UniProtKB/Swiss-Prot annotation:
Protein name (record): Prosaposin receptor GPR37
Region (Disordered): 103-228
Cytoplasmic side: 274-286, 344-366, 452-480, 540-600
CDD domains in UniProt: 7tmA_GPR37
One GO cellular component term: synapse
Originating gene: Gpr37
Length: 600
């Protein structure tokens, strides 16, 4: 028979067991969730996912490294087609990205990233044309790389090398939040809603590690593209002292000598012919016309060419690239036709000396001959304007302006007729240049001078004593024309050699050799324009006497020392010489004129 307290003890024991089970179940049900972010999919709340990403840094979780990738083409198509932050996530991607985008709103990503940001290029390739590299206000895309990423990868149990390998092999599956440039990374300002969507970050740019987006620096791993905020500066050719700087000093000194001598000499020739009544013949007018073009070459083209040679930049850019070759080729045409006209004029004088010097040509005849020379030279040089194009080449130095070259290249934007004519001229330019500007003046002048010299020798044998001095001056003038032709041919040979090398041996010749040939041909052209008046003063006594008279009239000492009797004798002697000069059109009956011409 059970005791009286047995039911009570059994009931109390059952209550204790029930209470123990309830307490154990309650204790097990209130265990907190782990904070290492191991929950997957929608089982994790947005708050836990956000907190986990803030602790590890975005893009460094184990799920990102183990993500199943979709094809790149489809992924890029989704990126380009997206117009807002609400984009469908990639297959197997993290759903927390979309919730984070919704929390951030349409104005941009959450501010204050946990680490520094830098550019990341996607396999060294440029993105498609939706991003413009040159506009600093375009959206720029970043992703974090810092020490926090290494620690988060260790906490997730994924080695850093494996994580970097996954990023390097498949970089196009990483999508980053766009940010506008010009804002500090720790700033609370949010980007404008104009730039929306996700885009791959373009290569070739990098931000400094201080987080400033204002001072751009070129990426170490790729070529420089687009404009930078660094001011490009011209190359200083004179400092520091190197072999190139010594060459720059030599070029500058030589150009100063050519410039000064050419300007003074050609101005003197034009002044003598224009201010001296007895020197206004057809031959002297042709020489004054030649002096004008030589003056134009030295005054306008020489400074531009020297500036380009020293700084590798054209001063007036595309205009100077087109106008300098045009003026140079037109000057060659003027020299060619002038030498041919001088040879014809000398042949007429040698055929009948007495009739030639009794014949006076009026101003309209001289103007017509000069107009034919000008129009022919300008029209033949016109295709040079169409062929020349300005090209820029990077020197490979940081902060240096790109080198500019004036190359022969036909623009495809020309009309069809002009384009066909330019192609035809380009194909025949080598032999046209060689035949018209080298063979024509040299061969024609040498042939005509030989015939003229033969006529002069025959006239000298049959002449009287009074005509021998005139024939001697004709022979002197003939030698002057031959000397001018030899000088012209010597200075034009390097230009033809440069054209032949460019046409047939351009692949086997370095760019430095081509530049050297080009600058030599340019300097020889300037040298020809400089030496022509000097040669004229040395070989032609009337020009030298007129030049000395022009110089002495500016000196008071010469005027004070000259007496009336001496000046009358000198004027009579000078007038007699001018009558016999081949440069003069004075009649023999006009020997009573005492004055030589107007003063300077």
């Amino acid at each position: 028979m059970p005791a009286r307290g047995a039911p009570l003890s059994r009931t109390s024991r059952l209550l204790l067991l029930l209470l123990f089970k309830v307490s154990v179940s309650a204790a097990l049900s209130f265990v907190p969730e782990p904070r290492n972010g191991t929950c997957l999919g929608e089982s994790c709340s947005p708050l836990i996912q956000r907190r986990s990403r803030d602790a590890r840094g975005p893009g460094n979780s184990a799920k990102d490294a183990l993500r199943v990738h979709v094809p790149r083409e489809k992924l890029e198509a989704e990126v380009r087609g997206a117009t807002s932050w609400d984009l469908p996530p990639p297959r197997g991607g993290d759903t927390g990205v979309i919730e984070e985008a919704a929390a951030a709103g349409p104005l941009g990503p959450p501010t204050k990233p946990p680490s520094a940001w830098r550019w990341k290029s996607a396999q060294g390739k440029e993105p498609s044309g939706h991003l413009r590299r040159r506009d600093p206000t375009d959206p720029q895309l970043f992703f974090p790389t810092s020490e926090g990423g290494e620690m988060s990868s260790k906490r997730d149990g994924i080695p850093q090398s494996r994580q970097e390998h996954s990023v390097k092999t498949e970089p196009r599956d990483l999508f980053y939040w766009p940010r506008r440039t010009g804002q500090l990374q720790d700033s609370q300002h949010r980007p404008s809603a104009v730039h929306e969507g996700r885009t791959l970050a373009p290569p070739g740019r990098a931000l400094p590690q201080n987080g400033s987006a204002d001072d751009w620096v070129p990426d170490q791993g790729g070529p420089r593209r687009g404009n930078t905020t660094r001011r490009v500066r011209l190359k200083n050719p004179f400092y520091p002292l190197t072999q190139e700087s010594y060459g720059a000093y030599a070029v500058m000194c030589l150009s100063v000598v050519i410039f000064g001598t050419g300007i003074i000499g050609n101005l003197a020739v034009m002044c003598i012919v224009c201010h001296n009544y007895y020197m206004r013949s057809i031959s002297n007018s042709l020489l004054a016309n030649l002096a004008f073009w030589d003056f134009l070459i030295i005054f306008f083209c020489l400074p531009l060419v020297i500036f380009h040679e020293l700084t590798k930049k054209w001063l007036l850019e595309d205009f100077s690239c087109k106008i300098v070759p045009y003026i140079e080729v037109a000057s060659l045409g003027v020299t060619t036709f002038t030498l041919c006209a001088l040879c014809i004029d000398r042949f007429r004088a040698a055929t009948n000396v007495q009739m030639y010097y009794e014949m006076i040509e009026n101003c309209s005849s001289t103007t017509a001959k000069l107009a034919v020379i000008w129009v022919g030279a300008l029209l033949l040089a016109l295709p040079e304007v169409v062929l020349r194009q300005l090209s820029k080449e990077d020197l490979g130095f940081s902060g240096q302006a790109p080198a500019e070259r004036c190359v022969i290249k036909i623009s495809p934007d020309l009309p069809d007729t002009i384009y066909v004519l330019a192609l035809t001229y380009d194909g025949a330019r080598l032999w046209w240049y060689f035949g018209c500007y080298f063979c024509l003046p040299t061969l024609f002048t040498i042939t005509c001078s030989l015939v003229t010299a033969r006529k002069i020798r025959k006239a000298e044998k049959a002449s009287t004593r009074g005509n021998k001095r005139q024939i001697h001056l004709e022979s002197q003038m003939n030698c002057t024309v031959v000397a001018l032709t030899i000088l012209y041919g010597f200075c034009i040979i390097p230009e033809n050699i440069c054209n032949i090398v460019t046409a047939y041996m351009a692949t086997g010749v370095s760019q430095q050799t081509m530049d050297l040939l080009n600058i030599i041909s340019q300097f020889l052209l300037f040298f020809k324009s400089c030496v022509t008046p000097v040669l004229l003063f040395c070989l032609c006594r009337p020009f030298s006497r007129a030049f000395m008279e022009c110089c002495c009239c500016c000196c008071e000492e010469c005027i004070q020392k000259s007496s009336t009797v001496t000046s009358d004798d000198n004027d009579n002697e000078y007038t007699t010489e001018l009558e016999l000069s081949p440069f003069s059109t004075i009649r023999r009956e006009m020997s009573t004129f005492a004055s030589v011409g107007t003063h300077c």
